[in-house]
């Protein structure tokens, strides 16, 4: 909560200082808002004196946590110059964006501040991005895509976060094919691997029933984030979808050895895969171990499954013992018969 509050505060401070007579720190000045080839910085516009005084008063009210007062002061400003109008709308939109329930109005003001294209380049670029972020937050996904693209076109910056959020907007729009390109760009641009674009990409293929491609992305996730157990499990399940039982077994076996398989149904899946891959002894052993440690319920059916696998592995004495346990729990004559045969 504190981090969120500080971030929102910084938005308002930035909105006030940019375009006002207050100087920014050298570090902020040195960061070019636009990196397009041949870009030349234009003349810096400053808000007019009359409007500036009222904006200063609103900012002081905001700093004293008199948010509603700040909003009232800014709302009453009747700016005449295009830059002053855009500047006030931007500042007011930034403040409203920090208040719950005022997202739509904030968006309206922020959009109006960039549509005229009179803000200074840094203000314009930051506002394009803020409009996109707020649109995503307000579930205005088409508008989010529009303004993320506008930000990229205006700045020529390659921002992995922007590409990830754009991919997310495409996902929410169910335009699954369109999210692949921004997701790939995000993956390539992140200095430290970020799971989000991988997951969006995987979801895109999965939703379109492109299961081989889904497996490919899942393999990338496991290789990039090997410590996250759930992805090993999901990769094993995805292999089953393309009927690659050997890779499914190998993957789930690693997951089991690393302690990633905890749910009974997943342990049973591993046991069944051993059986499918002609490894009945391992099938029986993994099931028996987890019945013994309580992860799998001790029922007649589960005991019979252990017995069947030991039977197939020609471990007749052990199989007979498990058939006996199954028979005692269920009084099923079939289990007694199988025990007798052995």
Describe every region a protein language model picked out.
Residues 64, 99-100, 138, 173, ...:
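Structural motif corresponding to the intra-repeat A-B loop/turn of tetratricopeptide repeats
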Residues 153-258, 262:
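Solenoidal tandem-repeat scaffolds enriched in leucines and small polar residues
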Residues 67, 102-103, 141, 176, ...:
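TPR-repeat structural position
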Residues 46-55, 83-89, 120-129, 155-165, ...:
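Generic helix N-cap/helix-start motif at coil->alpha-helix transitions
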Residues 2-126, 137, 146, 172:
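N-terminal leader/linker segments that initiate helical-solenoid repeat arrays
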């Amino acid at each position: 909560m504190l981090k969120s509050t500080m971030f929102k505060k910084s938005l308002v401070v930035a909105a006030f200082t940019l375009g006002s007579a207050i100087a920014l720190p050298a570090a902020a000045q040195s960061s070019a808002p636009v990196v397009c080839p041949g870009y030349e910085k234009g003349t810096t516009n400053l808000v007019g004196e009359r409007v500036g005084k009222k904006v200063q008063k609103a900012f002081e009210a905001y700093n004293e946590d008199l948010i509603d007062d700040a909003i009232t002061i800014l709302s009453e400003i009747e700016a005449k110059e295009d830059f002053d109008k855009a500047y006030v709308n931007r500042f007011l939109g930034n403040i409203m964006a920090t208040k719950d329930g005022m997202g739509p109005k904030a968006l309206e003001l922020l959009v109006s501040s960039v549509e005229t294209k009179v803000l200074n380049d840094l203000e314009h670029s930051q506002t394009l991005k803020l409009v996109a972020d707020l649109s995503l937050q307000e579930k205005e996904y088409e508008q989010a895509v529009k303004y993320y693209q506008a930000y990229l076109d205006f700045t020529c910056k390659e921002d992995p976060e922007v590409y990830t959020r754009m991919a997310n907007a495409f996902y929410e729009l169910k335009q699954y094919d369109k999210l692949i390109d921004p997701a790939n760009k995000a993956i390539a641009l992140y200095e430290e691997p970020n799971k989000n674009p991988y997951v969006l990409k995987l979801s895109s293929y999965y939703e379109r029933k492109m299961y081989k491609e889904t497996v490919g992305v899942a393999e990338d996730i496991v290789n990039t984030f090997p410590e996250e157990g759930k992805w090993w499990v999901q990769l094993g399940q995805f292999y089953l979808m393309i009927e690659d039982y050997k890779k499914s077994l190998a993957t789930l076996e690693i997951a089991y050895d690393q302690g990633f398989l905890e749910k009974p149904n997943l342990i049973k899946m591993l046991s069944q895969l051993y059986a499918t891959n002609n490894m009945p002894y391992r099938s029986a052993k993994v099931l028996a171990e987890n019945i013994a440690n309580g992860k799998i319920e001790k029922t007649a059916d589960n005991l019979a499954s252990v017995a069947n696998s030991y039977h197939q592995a020609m471990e007749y004495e052990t199989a007979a013992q498990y058939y006996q346990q199954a028979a005692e729990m269920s009084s099923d004559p079939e289990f007694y018969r199988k025990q007798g045969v052995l």
